[in-house]
Amino acid sequence: MSQPKILLLGAPGAGKGTQSSNIVDEYGVDHITTGDALRANKDMETEHGTPREFMEAGELVPDPVVNEIVQAAIDEADGFVLDGYPRNLSQAEYLSDITDVDVVALLDVGRDELVDRLTGRRMDPETGDIYHTEFNMPDDEEVRERLVQRDDDTEETVNERLDVFDENTQPVIDYYEDEGELVRIDGEASPDEVWDDLQAAIDDAL
């Protein structure tokens, strides 16, 4: 049996990274993120230029370039979990043209919970380690005292990021829901409970 092809949707802070790692460990598939794929293939020639040209200019990499890069990663993978793609409806339609996925799972988390999760993050500037004020603070008092909040984790910036996600990705969610493919997972449960539900959805689809 071929390895599963899994699409994991969810807002920033929904827990996609944690659950993607669980999927990789359990099913032995590749973890494909847009950012990693672009960085790994930044010099890949496409009809519209290389990712590097846009990244170095501080511009968003256009959809046709992102699509080609992600397709290359999918073609090389024996099963995958896609995390952070598709980000908009045109990418979702492109993905449907190039491959079939077994599971489309949405980690469903409310706005207030997302804001709490993201604004509570703290970073150790010396190590880059990430902590959280509510459920993951370091034991070492010296480390606790030097923790900082990153600029992109302030409440204003978090809400802006979530607004952008809603605007771009809600049509993607609607697209898969209309196709009858979307499985909603309660992302506000504990990470272990989320994983139990997600694994059950994957196993049910295979």
From Swiss-Prot:
CDD domains, A to Z: ADK
A Gene Ontology BP annotation from the UniProt entry: AMP salvage
Gene Ontology MF annotations: adenylate kinase activity; ATP binding
Spans annotated as LID: 120-153
InterPro entries assigned: Adenyl_kin_sub, Adenylat/UMP-CMP_kin, Adenylat_kinase_CS, P-loop_NTPase
Binding site for ATP: 13-18, 121, 130-131, 189
Domain characteristics, as noted in the entry: Consists of three domains, a large central CORE domain and two small peripheral domains, NMPbind and LID, which undergo movements during catalysis. The LID domain closes over the site of phosphoryl transfer upon ATP binding. Assembling and dissambling the active center during each catalytic cycle provides an effective means to prevent ATP hydrolysis.
Name of the protein in its database record: Adenylate kinase
